[in-house]
Amino acid sequence: MIYTVTLNPSVDYIVHVEDFTVGGLNRSSYDTKYPGGKGINVSRLLKRHHVASKALGFVGGFTGEYIKTFLREENLETAFSEVKGDTRINVKLKTGDETEINGQGPTISDEDFKAFLEQFQSLQEGDIVVLAGSIPSSLPHDTYEKIAEACKQQNARVVLDISGEALLKATEMKPFLMKPNHHELGEMFGTAITSVEEAVPYGKKLVEQGAEHVIVSMAGDGALLFTNEAVYFANVPKGKLVNSVGAGDSVVAGFLAGISKQLPLEEAFRLGVTSGSATAFSEELGTEEFVQQLLPEVKVTRL
């Protein structure tokens, strides 16, 4: 079973405004909303690949109810923990440029987190737990390490799609998969990475430090997969960037869908990269049909 963890989910409110004026009254030409959060995105994409998962995390208030209802209508299994306060709202303002205003989210108490952590005692050997997104400010910086340790005690596999301070300690958690982009990879080693060639030695280091699989996304330049045995490169299909939100999560979901379907590793990687592109070229998360349409354009080569 695949479990996704979103500690600080959101309702993403996307507003399109033409001729935006700062300090004046603006009217949207189009707006929509849907559940946000990297783990939730992974669950939603897995569903589109016909792979089951269960979404975990903290929700509260009317916005939390919206998320649960929305995912229920998509036939997604959830086991969210209820907290006081409202799940945050993140505003994505599209005016030609894209501006984001992210809410803080509710306070999570020590008791809330302790009860949440107990869920992982029921994991089975071989289960996959995806830890994705930001850590709420009310939780300690080592929150992901605590969850990863609880997973390891049950011989479950951990996937990390995280950033910031938590990413710096990612390899200590011995993840089954981690997925930094090239900027994050550079930050981990105190350097700037601008090309595939520059990324290769640092991706290899992450494997040497304990990660089983590492996918490094290089935006329009493709993506790299590192394992103990080999390094693979995948190009990305041509298309217009429409949506940067959720593309990396889609790579994770596509790769895990391929693993769940017991595809060869290169094919799972190819499915992941294509899934990321399908989302990047869409207003929302990419559909299965769009992924299949783009799949022939993506080629995987061993470096």
Swiss-Prot record:
PROSITE patterns to which the protein is assigned, alphabetical: PFKB_KINASES_2 (PS00584)
Keyword set includes Kinase: yes
Keywords: ATP-binding, Kinase, Nucleotide-binding, Transferase
GO-annotated molecular function: 1-phosphofructokinase activity; ATP binding; phosphofructokinase activity
Active site: 249
One Pfam family in the UniProt entry: PfkB
Entry binding sites for ATP: 248-249
Listed GO CC annotations: cytosol
Reaction(s) catalysed (UniProt annotation): beta-D-fructose 1-phosphate + ATP = beta-D-fructose 1,6-bisphosphate + ADP + H(+)
Disulfide bonding pattern of the chain: none
Enzyme category, top tier: transferase
Domain of life: Bacteria
EC number of the protein: 2.7.1.56
Family stated for the protein in its record: Belongs to the carbohydrate kinase PfkB family.
UniProt function note: Catalyzes the ATP-dependent phosphorylation of fructose-l-phosphate to fructose-l,6-bisphosphate.
Name of the molecule in the record: 1-phosphofructokinase
Organism: Bacillus subtilis (strain 168)
Lineage of the organism: Bacteria, Bacillati, Bacillota, Bacilli, Bacillales
Gene this chain is encoded by: fruK
